[in-house]
């Protein structure tokens, strides 16, 4: 499960209280899924705990078994959706020809995910104002993972060895930014072949515009 689970939720921590049974885990999952729909459709300000519990099919009191507030739920949801993205693109790194092929496959999987979870854009964007730390964490951890993969690729000779760690960090942020807006353009605003989009973007990564 993508939500960050701890023994006790602290105000503003974005943590859900620990489910102690499989049934509790399923209930927490229902609340998170209902929150994604509610926040995605109505936005944070216009969403309500009552609306979320009605969507989830749980009692109002059940909500407070897991979360202290709407803000705490939103924070947990942002981290949960970040975890879902990680889990979705994970298979891209198994069996890829090289690091850049893995990035191509990861982008294709992300584009498919974004097409099926279009509300992720509204939720992540709103988190900049509702929970700036979660918003920053979402992007920083993503870029950090990309940069780490590129450093490993440099050691294998799959990207230029003269690129410094700082260079690869810049590349990681540029790559992530491109992926975010490709998802917005070709999965949210319009529907395009994810493989085709990923192939074209990967060509830019491999060769640039000059070749």
Feature-to-residue mapping (PLM):
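Basic, helix-initiating cap at the start of DNA-binding domains
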Residues: 1-42, 49-55, 72
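Hydrophobic alpha-helical segments that form the core
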Residues: 3-8, 111-113, 163-185, 196-207
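An amphipathic alpha-helix adjacent to DNA-recognition modules
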Residues: 25-33, 45-46, 57, 65-90, ...
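Conserved hydrophobic residue
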Residues: 44-45, 159-160
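Key DNA-contact positions within bacterial/archaeal DNA-binding proteins
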Residues: 61
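Amphipathic alpha-helical segments used for helix-helix packing
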Residues: 102, 111-133, 181-188
């Amino acid at each position: 499960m993508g939500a960050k689970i701890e023994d006790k939720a602290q105000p503003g921590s974005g943590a859900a209280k620990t489910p102690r049974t499989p049934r509790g885990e399923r209930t927490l999952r229902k609340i998170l899924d209902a929150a994604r729909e509610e926040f995605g459709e109505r936005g944070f300000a216009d969403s309500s705990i009552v609306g979320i519990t009605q969507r989830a099919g749980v009692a109002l009191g059940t909500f407070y078994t897991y979360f202290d507030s709407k803000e705490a739920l939103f924070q947990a949801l942002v981290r949960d959706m970040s975890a879902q993205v990680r889990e979705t693109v994970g298979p891209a790194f198994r069996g890829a020809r090289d690091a850049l092929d893995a990035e191509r496959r990861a982008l294709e999987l992300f584009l498919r995910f974004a097409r099926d979870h279009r509300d992720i854009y509204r939720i992540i964007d709103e988190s900049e104002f509702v929970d700036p730390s979660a918003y920053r964490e979402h992007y920083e951890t993503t870029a950090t993972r990309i940069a780490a993969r590129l450093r490993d690729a440099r050691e294998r000779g799959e990207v230029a060895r003269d690129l410094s760690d700082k260079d690869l960090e810049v590349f990681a942020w540029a790559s992530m930014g491109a992926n975010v807006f490709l998802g917005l353009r070709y999965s949210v605003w319009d529907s395009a072949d994810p493989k085709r989009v990923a192939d074209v973007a990967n060509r830019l990564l491999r060769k640039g515009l000059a070749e």
